[in-house]
Amino acid sequence: MGGEWIETTVGEFCPFEYGKGLPERKRKLGPYPVFGSNGRVGSHVEPLIKSSGIIIGRKGTVGSVHFSKVPFWPIDTAFYVVDASHRDLRFTYYMLQSLGLDQMNADSAVPGLNRTAAHARNIKVPPLSEQQAIACILGSLDDKIELNRQMNRTLEEMA
């Protein structure tokens, strides 16, 4: 590691796209997760996004960041980011989690994340190879945390 990190903005590095409405009454139980601003809210028979991606809370649970390893449907209370050749998606997920987007509430009645303000955030990003190495390390730690959670659930069920 040790390549030059570049200064850019969130909007240039990983532009947020708007999710698309999918009311509960129109959802058909299926294999693809449906995400809102607070995480997974159901499933559907077809995905809007045909790859893995990042989901960012736009309305309600402002700035929450979720990752889908499978194709998914982000509803209109969320933004999403998909992979691109210049960035590692897992690195991007971890980077977005570290930005404090949940502190960027722009609306008073219903909490909301202003895309323009989020896009304007200055960030520094490493070369792709370093992004991949960082994501690998953090992903291993996430896997270990999940394994520990599963072990705790199993032990609690046995007690």
What are these regions (language model features)?
Residues M1-G36, K124-A159:
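Non-catalytic DNA-recognition/assembly elements of restriction-modification systems
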Residues G36-L101, A106-A109, N114-A118:
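A short beta-sheet element
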